[in-house]
Structures are given as C-alpha cells and as structure tokens.
C-alpha cells in the first residue's frame, strides 16, 4: 500500500506497535492513501480532519454563492432590456447541462479539489460581467460559467461523499447517517447564501424601487467580488481526496488514455440511464431544478416585485434562504436511510404544493404589512421545499450509487440544469398560470414515481462500510 501519511503527520513504523492498530490502519478506505502503522494521535487526527474539510467546503461555498445567488435573483428584474437577464441565465443552464455530460470525466482527471478551485473562476467572472451587463459580457460569461458550474458541483458531491465515507469508517459509524449529517451541514450553510446575499442586496438597493434601474448595483457587485475572492482562497485549504473505488483509481491513473476514459464515460452515462433506481429518481431531480428556476425567474418577477417592489426581492429571498438553511440542517440530521428520506421529501413537497395552490387560486392579502408578511410566508415555504430536496437528493445519490459517485452526481446536474434552462427559455413565452400548472403536475408525478422507488428498494439498510469492516 502506498503511504501518504506525511500529509496528516508523519507516522513511523514501530516493532512494538499494537497489531490491532495496524489492522485498523490498513482497513481505511481507498479514497485516501494511508500509512500501514499509526499511533493514537495520528489516528485521532485522521478521524477529525474529515469534519474540518466539510466546515471549510461549506463556508467557501457560502461566500462564493451568496454573491452569485443574489446576482441571479436580480437578473429577471434588473437586466430587462431584450430579456438579457433571463436569456443569459437560460444560456448558463443550457451550457451547464451540456458540460455536465463530461463533468465526471473532468473531475476524475483534475481531482475533486482542483475541480472546486477552477469552478470558482466562472462565478467570479459572471459577477464581474454584471458590472457592465450587455450581450458581449454576460453571454460569454454565462457559457464559461456553465462549464465551471458543472465541475464544481460534481466535485462538491464527490468530495463530500468521500469525506463522509472515510469518516464513517474511521469512527465505525453508520455510513448513511454520516452522509446525511455531512449533507445536512453543507446544505444548511450553503442555503444561508440566499439569506446573507439578499440582505446585502436589500441594504444596498433599499432606495431602488424601479424595475430595470441600475442605481447602486455597481457597489453591490464590487462588494460581491471581494467576498467571492475570500471564498476561493478558503478552498485552497481543503485536503486533496482521490477516487472512491478501485475502478475510479484505475481511470484516473497515468496509464489511462483519453480514448479509454471517454469509453468509460460513455459506459458510465449509459449504465446510469439503464439503472432503474436512477430512472425513478430523475423526475424528482427534474422537479428540483424546475422549482429553483421558478423562484429565481418567476416568483421574484410576478409575485414579489408587483407586491413589494424590487427592493423586496432581497428581503423575500432572505426569508427563502433562512428557511432553506434551517430545513437543510434538520433534514440532514434526521436522514438515516431511504425510509427517512421518503418521509422528509413528502413534507418538503407538501410545503411547495401549498404555495402553488395558493398562487393558482390567486389568493392574496391587501398591500401593507400583512401583504409583505404573506409574500415572506410564501418564500419561506418555497425555501423549506428546496432545503429538503437538495439535502435528500444528494444523500440519496450518495447512498444508492456509491460505486460511481461522479457519474451519479453528473446525472443529478444534467437533469436539474436541463429543466432550469427550459424554464428560462420558455417561461417568457407562456403565462404565469401555465407555469404553475406545469409545476404542480410535475410535483405530483415525481412524488408518485419516488414512492415507487421507495417500494422497490424497500427497507433494505444503507450499505455501511463500517459495519462490513
């Protein structure tokens, strides 16, 4: 076995070392090469650095995405000339969809940490393009961000799942529960980007009530660029992680040629689409993308802005982010396997169904304080649904597809982004009520198919590496 112990503290072989420690060291998972022999302090260090990496990853994503999330929320109300804002977002997610097809291969070649670092550059460039928004700045930035987003999200899912599996093995914990905990922490912190980013937006644009006005946006985007830079720097402190399985190690080895890699990628994508479990998850993945695009493009434009003005976008999305974060944390803590995931997803979908029905019935409260509270209430329910879906889908994929983690997370992003792109391109062509009907229909369909998955898999326990060892 190769030794990489120097990364975590040098641990020398000693003749008197306890044989049980040798056995424990050799049983550690393949995503991190480990020394054959270790002392107690070295072993304890290995047990703790996985959680440290999750803390760093979560905070870095918060800093990067609080800027991008706020900029994205403003596109449909700020860059309104020739629908530049929504069109650029449509191009972004179309690019995201196409690049997600090869994202798993890119992440395997680069490694998950390098993919995360390169991925941040696209978000910085996109926010910078908003300093002078036009077709020649936003469109190229959107295309490049599509590539960067595809690798940063596949890298994130791979990195987080690898850390969870290693942590469960090192501490002899249930793997499914650890994956749920790690995803809960990440998505809870990540969801705060909506809360913090939109509070900053509200503070800097509080005097800006007119749709299409650019007053104060230059300062806003400059502040965001500084914050994103700190997030990118923070990612440099992540520890490198390798492949999760023997097959992935072989693919990323130096002797793996380009043709072999592409062939493996094609087989991986075809295998995922022929897997009944993945086919049963795809409708729910598609709905998760649809509901995100609805919040960014439709809810802010047709519900929030007419009721409380463009400055209300910041406060309503802050409420959305707050509930998103709280529910992500709670959902992650409660996740232990498919049964708990099914229950939690049911609650999240019900919350969003309530919003869709209220909007379809055109239920509203008179303007003023109660009107504002009603908008914040709707935003909070949407945040609950998003927090549940993001946490549970990532945990579910980590549990069910442990032998091809990159490929499974690539499928997640392909289907999410395809539906998001469709919304940004076609929503302007159909009425708001038609969008609501489509969303409600897909919600019901995806939930029924997801219940079929739960029945198919049954109550089979999540594989736990720790239990096998």
Which functions belong to the PLM regions below?
Residues 68-72, 198, 270, 276-318, ...:
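Extracytoplasmic gate region of multi-pass secondary transporters
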């Amino acid at each position: 076995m190769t030794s990489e112990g120097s990364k975590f503290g040098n641990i020398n072989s000693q003749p008197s070392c306890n044989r049980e420690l040798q056995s424990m060291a050799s049983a550690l998972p393949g995503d991190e090469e480990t020394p054959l022999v270790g002392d107690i302090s070295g072993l304890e260090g290995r047990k703790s650095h996985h959680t440290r990496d999750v803390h760093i990853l979560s905070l870095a994503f918060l800093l990067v995405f609080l800027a991008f999330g706020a900029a994205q929320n403003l596109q449909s109300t700020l860059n309104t000339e020739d629908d530049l804002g929504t069109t650029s977002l449509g191009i972004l997610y179309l690019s995201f969809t196409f690049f997600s097809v090869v994202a798993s291969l890119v992440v395997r070649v680069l490694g998950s940490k390098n993919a995360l670092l390169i991925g941040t550059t696209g978000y910085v460039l996109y926010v910078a393009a908003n300093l002078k928004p036009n077709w020649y700045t936003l469109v190229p930035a959107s295309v490049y961000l599509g590539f960067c987003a595809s690798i940063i999200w596949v890298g994130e899912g791979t990195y987080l799942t690898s850390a969870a599996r290693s942590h469960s093995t090192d501490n002899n914990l249930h793997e499914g529960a650890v994956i749920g905990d790690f995803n809960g922490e990440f998505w809870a912190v990540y969801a705060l980007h909506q809360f913090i980013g939109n509070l900053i937006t509200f503070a800097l644009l509080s005097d800006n009530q007119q749709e299409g006005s650019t007053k104060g946006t230059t300062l806003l985007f400059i502040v965001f660029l500084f914050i994103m830079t700190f997030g990118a720097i923070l990612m440099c402190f992540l520890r490198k992680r390798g492949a999760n399985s023997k097959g992935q190690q072989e693919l990323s080895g130096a002797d793996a040629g380009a043709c072999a890699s592409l062939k493996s990628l094609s087989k991986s994508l075809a295998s995922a689409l022929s897997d009944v479990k993945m086919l049963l998850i795809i409708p729910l993945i598609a709905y998760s993308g649809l509901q995100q695009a609805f919040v960014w493009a439709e809810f802010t434009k047709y519900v929030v802005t007419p009721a409380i003005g463009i400055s209300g976008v910041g406060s309503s999305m802050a409420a959305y982010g707050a509930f998103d974060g709280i529910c992500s944390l709670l959902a992650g803590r409660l996740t232990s396997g498919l049964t708990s995931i099914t229950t939690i997803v049911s609650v999240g979908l019900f919350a969003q169904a309530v919003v869709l029905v209220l909007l379809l019935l055109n239920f509203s409260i008179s303007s003023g304080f109660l009107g504002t509270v009603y908008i914040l209430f709707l935003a909070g329910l949407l945040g609950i649904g998003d927090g549940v879906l993001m946490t549970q889908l990532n945990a579910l994929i980590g549990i069910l597809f442990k032998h091809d983690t990159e490929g499974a997370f690539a499928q997640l992003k392909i289907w999410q982004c395809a539906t998001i792109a469709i919304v940004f391109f076609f929503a302007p062509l159909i009425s708001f009520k038609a969008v609501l009907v489509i969303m409600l229909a897909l919600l019901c369909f995806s939930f029924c198919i997801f219940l079929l998955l739960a029945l198919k898999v049954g109550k089979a326990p999540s594989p736990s590496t720790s239990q096998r060892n």
